[in-house]
Amino acid sequence: MAELTALESLIEMGFPKGRAEKALALTGNQGIEAAMDWLMEHEDDPDVDEPLATPLGHVLGREPTPSEQGGPKGPGSAVGEGKPVLTEEERQEQTKRMLELVAQKQREREEREEREALERERQRRRQGQELTAARQRLQEDEMRRAAEERRREKAEELEARQRVREKIERDKAERAKKYGGNVGSQPSPPATEPGPVPSSPSREPPTKREYDQCRIQVRLPDGTSLTQTFRAREQLAAVRLYVELHRGEELGGAQDPVQLLSGFPRRAFSEADMERPLQELGLVPSAVLIVAKKCPG
């Protein structure tokens, strides 16, 4: 039974002649299987159907003859010898084998593409998990820092309250030592000795109240105002930062620094004042500040 040539087999399987010839030529006429591999790998190439430039006298897809290969001529290689013709049954059988080979190659290609897709999906999920873990670590770090800041502020408040209580106790002890006995107790005049009622001793001025917070109202150049509560120990720079973050666009944007003024008594706060606590600047328990553009220099 005579076999179909590789080119005829590819055409029989439905491949265009030009594409089949190109596949055989580019694979060095190594057989139908190599040509089929090339066709499947390059079927989506935009230039797959473009003709291939070949040397003069060479026919794409034609298997080289023994004379072209330089080998000896066999008894059946006479010029003009007719090629055996396949019967219809033989042709169908050979076509069936070729189609099975095509189907096998297609299955192998689909399996390879499926494996590659699965690997890409695993890679995508792995990257997503790593990104989620990184975000979670960042969030945990931020929460931990916030908790530490709250604990620090609470400790500072407790220390400040303790200092206030200790000062009150010292003041009480000093008054008791000065006037004798308990604070507020006054010696009663003798009942048996009539006479003018002794004048009560002069009272100590009331202890100045300690404030932990202060309410600041900031008036902006456009007539609007901002109101915020700050801790008495916070620096004036905290008020300026609050204004720069919450003011509108009328001052030229957040890149332009501002200057804080007090209305009465009239005072312009300097950079050195920004480092001083609000309590020390006399802004406790409440104050009104005016915002102006900071002059350059």
Curated annotation (Swiss-Prot):
Regions of compositional bias (Pro residues) in chain numbering: 187-199
Domain UBA: start-end pairs: 2-42
InterPro entries: UBA, UBA-like_sf, UBA_UBXN1, Ubiquitin-like_domsf, UBX_dom
GO biological process assignments: negative regulation of ERAD pathway; negative regulation of proteasomal ubiquitin-dependent protein catabolic process; negative regulation of protein K48-linked deubiquitination; negative regulation of protein ubiquitination
Modified residues annotated as Phosphoserine in this record: 199-200, 270
GO CC list: cytoplasm; cytosol; nucleoplasm; nucleus; VCP-NPL4-UFD1 AAA ATPase complex
PROSITE patterns: UBA, UBX
Keyword terms: Acetylation, Coiled coil, Cytoplasm, Phosphoprotein
Composition bias, Basic and acidic residues: 86-122, 137-177
SUPFAM superfamilies on file: UBA-like, Ubiquitin-like
Coiled-coil segments on the chain, per record: 86-176
Gene3D superfamilies with a match to the protein in the record: DNA helicase RuvA subunit, C-terminal domain, Phosphatidylinositol 3-kinase Catalytic Subunit, Chain A, domain 1
Gene Ontology molecular function: ATPase binding; K48-linked polyubiquitin modification-dependent protein binding; K6-linked polyubiquitin modification-dependent protein binding; proteasome regulatory particle binding; ubiquitin binding; ubiquitin protein ligase binding
Record keyword Cytoplasm present: yes
Principal location class: cytoplasm
Domain UBX: 209-291
Pfam families (alphabetical): UBA_7, UBX
Modified residues (Phosphothreonine): 207, 229
Region: Disordered, residue numbers: 40-210
Cellular localisation: Cytoplasm
Subunit structure: Component of a complex required to couple retrotranslocation, ubiquitination and deglycosylation composed of NGLY1, SAKS1, AMFR, VCP and RAD23B. Interacts with HOMER2. Interacts directly with VCP. Interacts with BRCA1 and BARD1; interaction takes place when BRCA1 is not autoubiquitinated bur is strongly enhanced in the presence of autoubiquitinated BRCA1.
Domain notes: The UBA domain specifically recognizes and binds 'Lys-6'-linked polyubiquitin chains.
Protein name (record): UBX domain-containing protein 1
